[in-house]
């Protein structure tokens, strides 16, 4: 099988040296992502496209899906590469490929040509289009807005029959811009802002301020791992978790109620800046949107920025909540965010929307900054790829099984779309579907006399959810890994 990768248009308008660098980085990213599917896979870069060739036909859909999620790719063409002799040969091959697709449909033919030939692109379009129209009685030509567009590419003595076109996410390849540190909470905003910086070519590391205990951190780990695995797995990134409960306790005790929200955000920026400096990261990323909550007025954002020299990027600053939720739905983080607990809002009952710098600084004079230094020093820093391994260690009390007994039921916790695309069928045992994001509210409704074997494709989500359910007091859960 063969795929032709078309570059994001902004890459093609760069200078020659920058364009070549971007293409080289994108080629490396594609190799890093796809090597898990086919070790014999070949990735070849050209001036205006990248070729991907693979032998394992069983991995075709997985490879195609992975390519659509790599930043820097505008669209992917799945092609059949065959030799040809003349225009009539091109027509015959096009007829064999597209006959079934065109029956009862309107169509047009579009040809791109490279190399020296005795015919032009328009001549091929007319010849092939006329031939298809004659040989498929139920089809008819329509040059504007047809049901089907027959795409052909001619390069020297090779014909590329385009079997399908699939849109990528665009943007710049990860690694073409400098690293950033995303302040991730697991909600709608931070997930979308992290994705937007990945799409713009940044390697995004994650910093999580834990205000709600182990269950909250597990949920945020899921979001960070999902974003990395889906859009940024070409690069290694860090997940830094800081236990911020001592800081919150100090704020509740020492800071005036109305100033708590701004002071908390200033403490977070101070801590994140220390982490960024430690790892040589150039900027922080937040999901703040202007006026969304009390701490996100211009006055308060300016006061928050003042505590650090580190650049703070806010890609969602002008977005409304509905737009952000729609983006979260598109990238697949909406369901995570809907079930994520929100802790920041409970810290202040009557927050100020226009904090005064002198008053904020006066309140902070009462704060014991050694507490902040201590929690940063004790921050838990892991390679995001190790989250699965760490989860396996943490869920040591949750048994992992490869078989099943008479009282066991397999619980497929994949998302609804994944279940529809690839239903799980196991002989000799019942399989029940319950997406991971409904476990917290719906697992208790299941028959608790049964033993539930949690299953997902890679085993990461099933381990995380098993730990969560154990913490909630459910002892009848195991992890199923056949």
Curated annotation (Swiss-Prot):
Span of domain Rhodanese: 404-482
Catalysis performed (reactions): [ThiI sulfur-carrier protein]-S-sulfanyl-L-cysteine + a uridine in tRNA + 2 reduced [2Fe-2S]-[ferredoxin] + ATP + H(+) = [ThiI sulfur-carrier protein]-L-cysteine + a 4-thiouridine in tRNA + 2 oxidized [2Fe-2S]-[ferredoxin] + AMP + diphosphate; [ThiS sulfur-carrier protein]-C-terminal Gly-Gly-AMP + S-sulfanyl-L-cysteinyl-[cysteine desulfurase] + AH2 = [ThiS sulfur-carrier protein]-C-terminal-Gly-aminoethanethioate + L-cysteinyl-[cysteine desulfurase] + A + AMP + 2 H(+)
Claim: Nucleotide-binding is one of the keywords in the record: yes
GO MF, one example: CCA tRNA nucleotidyltransferase activity
GO cellular component: cytosol
Limits of the THUMP domain: 61-165
EC number in record: 2.8.1.4
Pathway(s) the chain acts in: Cofactor biosynthesis; thiamine diphosphate biosynthesis
Disulfide bridge map: 344-456
Active site: 456 (cysteine persulfide intermediate)
Short name of one Pfam family: ThiI
Keyword Transmembrane helix: no
Any GO BP: thiamine biosynthetic process
Compartment(s): Cytoplasm
Keyword annotations of the record: ATP-binding, Cytoplasm, Disulfide bond, Nucleotide-binding, Redox-active center, RNA-binding, Thiamine biosynthesis, Transferase, tRNA-binding
SUPFAM superfamilies: Adenine nucleotide alpha hydrolases-like (SSF52402), Rhodanese/Cell cycle control phosphatase (SSF52821), THUMP domain-like (SSF143437)
InterPro entries on file: Rhodanese-like_dom (IPR001763), Rhodanese-like_dom_sf (IPR036873), Rossmann-like_a/b/a_fold (IPR014729), ThiI_AANH (IPR020536), ThiI_fer (IPR054173), ThiI_N (IPR049961), THII_Thiazole_biosynth_dom (IPR026340), THUMP_dom (IPR004114)
Residues that coordinate or bind ATP: 183-184, 265, 287, 296
Family the UniProt entry places it in: Belongs to the ThiI family.
NCBIfam families named in the record: ThiI_C_thiazole (TIGR04271), tRNA uracil 4-sulfurtransferase ThiI (TIGR00342)
Function, in words: Catalyzes the ATP-dependent transfer of a sulfur to tRNA to produce 4-thiouridine in position 8 of tRNAs, which functions as a near-UV photosensor. Also catalyzes the transfer of sulfur to the sulfur carrier protein ThiS, forming ThiS-thiocarboxylate. This is a step in the synthesis of thiazole, in the thiamine biosynthesis pathway. The sulfur is donated as persulfide by IscS.
Protein name: tRNA sulfurtransferase
Source organism of the structure: Salmonella choleraesuis (strain SC-B67)
